[in-house]
């Protein structure tokens, strides 16, 4: 069973406990574990002998080391999206990870830039945050501009439906990485040509996100029509339908 985002971590804990009581051999459990504290508790309480981290090891292969060093805020959590790992595995393609673009390229690392540049990143969604972090790690001076008062972009909206809250962990981890790397983040700042001319960046990364796909249906522009993004963002109410 490949547990999706809506399934909580450790969902099979009670079943594993029953198996542990019934057998005399070591029991290893797996079940969307992303928190080392929970895994440690399972072993300490004798509910299992070992906890296996599957997809979490793809999202962050250094998670055990970070837990040992008590750097929990640095961990990159698996959001159980099943997009880069399971979907590619069944398609016979190389496995990748939505929260860890370095998967499979760990040995390459982030090569330092030959020349440090002043970099402007437009957009504080996940793509913008990731680009800003990597550029800063390469040695550039990076400033990220977000037009609204919230980071995360469309991924933030994707986390609002019931059962999707863990998606916010992806946003949080990128924010933490940017902050620790030294990225300057400016909120409520729309980027204009005048601002670009004023700041004089060497490079500009446009990560302003996508626009909602609206089908060409007659009447779709009626004010009574509520679009999903407006509903999720709290800009419109859907009533009790």
Predicted regions and their residues:
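Alpha-helix C-terminal capping/helix-to-coil transition sites in glycosyltransferase folds
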Residues: 47, 198-200
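Beta1-alpha1 glycine-rich phosphate/pyrophosphate-binding loop at the start
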Residues: 121-188, 213
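Flavin-dependent oxidoreductase catalytic cores
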Residues: 1-122, 126-142, 150, 222, ...
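Short hydrophobic core segments
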Residues: 145, 201-208
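Short acidic loop-to-helix transition motifs that present clustered carboxylates
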Residues: 34-37, 58, 190-193, 231-234
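Short, contiguous acidic/charged loop-to-helix segments that flank catalytic cores in large enzymes
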Residues: 2-8, 110-116, 157-169, 227-235
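Glycine-rich dinucleotide-binding loop and its adjacent helix/turn
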Residues: 100-112, 176-179, 185-187, 194, ...
């Amino acid at each position: 069973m490949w547990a999706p985002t809506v399934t909580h971590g450790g969902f099979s804990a009670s079943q594993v406990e029953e198996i542990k009581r019934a057998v005399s051999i070591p029991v290893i459990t797996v079940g969307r574990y992303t928190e080392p504290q929970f895994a440690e508790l399972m072993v300490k309480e004798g509910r299992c002998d070992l906890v296996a981290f599957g997809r979490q090891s793809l999202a962050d292969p250094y998670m055990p080391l970070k837990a040992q060093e008590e750097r929990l805020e640095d961990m990159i959590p698996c959001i159980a999206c099943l997009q880069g790992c399971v979907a590619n595995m069944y398609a016979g393609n190389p496995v990748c990870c939505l929260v860890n673009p370095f998967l499979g390229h760990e040995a390459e690392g982030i090569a330092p830039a030959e020349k440090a540049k002043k970099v402007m990143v437009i957009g504080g969604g996940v793509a913008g945050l990731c680009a800003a972090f990597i550029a800063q790690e390469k040695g550039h001076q990076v400033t990220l501009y977000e037009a609204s008062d919230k980071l995360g972009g469309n991924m933030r909206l994707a986390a609002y439906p019931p059962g999707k809250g863990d998606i916010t962990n992806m946003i949080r981890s990128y924010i933490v990485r940017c902050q620790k790397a030294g990225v300057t983040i400016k909120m409520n700042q729309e980027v204009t040509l005048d601002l670009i001319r004023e700041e004089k960046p060497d490079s500009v990364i446009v990560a302003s996100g996508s626009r909602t796909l609206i089908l060409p249906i007659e009447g779709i522009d009626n004010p009574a029509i509520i679009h999903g993004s407006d509903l999720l963002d709290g800009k419109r109410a859907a009533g009790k339908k």
